[in-house]
Amino acid sequence: MENILDLWNQALAQIEKKLSKPSFETWMKSTKAHSLQGDTLTITAPNEFARDWLESRYLHLIADTIYELTGEELSIKFVIPQNQDVEDFMPKPQVKKAVKEDTSDFPQNMLNPKYTFDTFVIGSGNRFAHAASLAVAEAPAKAYNPLFIYGGVGLGKTHLMHAIGHYVIDHNPSAKVVYLSSEKFTNEFINSIRDNKAVDFRNRYRNVDVLLIDDIQFLAGKEQTQEEFFHTFNTLHEESKQIVISSDRPPKEIPTLEDRLRSRFEWGLITDITPPDLETRIAILRKKAKAEGLDIPNEVMLYIANQIDSNIRELEGALIRVVAYSSLINKDINADLAAEALKDIIPSSKPKVITIKEIQRVVGQQFNIKLEDFKAKKRTKSVAFPRQIAMYLSREMTDSSLPKIGEEFGGRDHTTVIHAHEKISKLLADDEQLQQHVKEIKEQLK
């Protein structure tokens, strides 16, 4: 069969004729041919959402198109690239190789062209890690060696490591830069023993200028691999070569990691990355939208940033999902559409933040009184009773202190709040009508 890349490009050209432009641009354009093994053609999708959609909607179309081109019935399989942050639906630019082509005995690792210092969004949670990474890139083995970056999944550790690699190569094209995961290091080490090529393996990783090794926690419990990496580390460090390491936790918390490795990781600088704050999340979304030429309303970016606060990967994935959903149903992007698109991925356990003002608003609607009446000095039953219910609910449904609640009700004393809470609690024990009123108010608030 012809070259797999050529085949897939031909298939895409045919599929483009069969789909609407929005559907093709959204779902097909970002796919890549991965491999052909036996009668199974494997295609990469940018993320889980795209993979699931392709499998459910376009599997037969793709298989039929391949058959038309080759006369062969192939099974189609979709995968997501491993160790890669959320990608978008746009075609990827040519990747930059981390080493020059003429070094044939050197590992041909690739750096993600999107992971540069220019595309990294700086916030309070990553500012120090970014500064340290830039310092290392500007002066390899002279600033911090090793540089150890740790933090949760999808927070930008890999981005910074690739950015260091790009910067070094851009300023010194002859530099030998290698990026790999510790899992790949382990697998290659095992294969070198099996194939009796241990010397080749050592030469490959001990003759570099910059070694960027991701997810070092994977070495935990692997004694022989730790032994090999220990000597690799020593060789590079003694020859003033830069080492950058990432992990999901600090060295002292990696289980079954040899003390001698742990101590060496602590020779240089250890810095963490924490989840981005709201302002940083919004900035990340804006930069992503601008890079892809997307016009996303501010209210939508604020909504996504408020809902997704765990990591950058999920944040960008949510934006992709909203854009894709908008394209599919052919509607403009707004906050309501974003809520609909993300309803399946926003944690249902995430509690809504209920405020005293919101309680006053809902109680006011139930009893037909104005918001200002809650703070007024009126003592008529038509106002005082709803006010007491609102105080009761403020005590039950918010974390506000008694003085704070009193302040929100016209500067009343905290003893007034206590009295209101006790009174409504007693009435609720016997008054079914009041029970129903309070139940309805709580349901509206939730």
Swiss-Prot record:
User: Which GO CC terms are listed, alphabetically?
Assistant: cytoplasm; DnaA-oriC complex; nucleoid; plasma membrane
InterPro entries recorded = AAA+_ATPase, Chromosome_initiator_DnaA, Chromosome_initiator_DnaA-like, Chromosome_initiator_DnaA_CS, DnaA_C, DnaA_dom, DnaA_N_dom, DnaA_N_sf
Impact upon substituting R313A: Binds but does not hydrolyze ATP, still oligomerizes
Q: Indicate the impact reported for F49Y.
A: No longer sensitive to SirA overexpression, no longer interacts with SirA
How changing A163P affects the protein? Answer: No longer interacts with itself, DnaD or YabA
Q: Where is this region: Domain I, interacts with DnaA modulators?
A: 1-82
Could you say which residues bind ATP here? G154, L155, G156, K157, T158
Q: What is the effect of changing A50T?
A: No longer sensitive to SirA overexpression, no longer interacts with SirA, DnaA interacts normally with replication origin
Phenotype when the gene is knocked out:
No change in YabA foci (in a strain that does not depend on dnaA for replication).
State its Enzyme Commission number(s). 3.6.4.-
Superkingdom of origin: Bacteria
Region feature (linker) = 333-346
Reported induction: Part of the dnaA-dnaN operon, represses transcription of its own operon.
Outline the segment boundaries, as ranges, of region: Domain III, AAA+ region: 104-332
For Mg(2+), which residues are the binding ones? T158, D214, D215
Q: Which family does it belong to?
A: Belongs to the DnaA family.
Q: How does it assemble?
A: The DNA replisome assembles sequentially on oriC in this order; DnaA, DnaD, DnaB, DnaI-DnaC helicase. Oligomerizes as a right-handed, spiral filament on DNA at oriC. Forms an ATP-dependent helix on DNA at oriC; both DnaD and YabA inhibit formation of the DnaA helix. Forms an ATP-dependent oligomer, formation is stimulated by ds- and ssDNA; monomeric ADP-Soj inhibits oligomer formation. Interacts with DnaD. Interacts with YabA, and via YabA, with the replication machinery subunit beta sliding clamp DnaN. Interacts with YabA via domain IIIa (residues 109-275).
| Protein's recorded name | Chromosomal replication initiator protein DnaA
Source organism of the structure? Bacillus subtilis (strain 168)
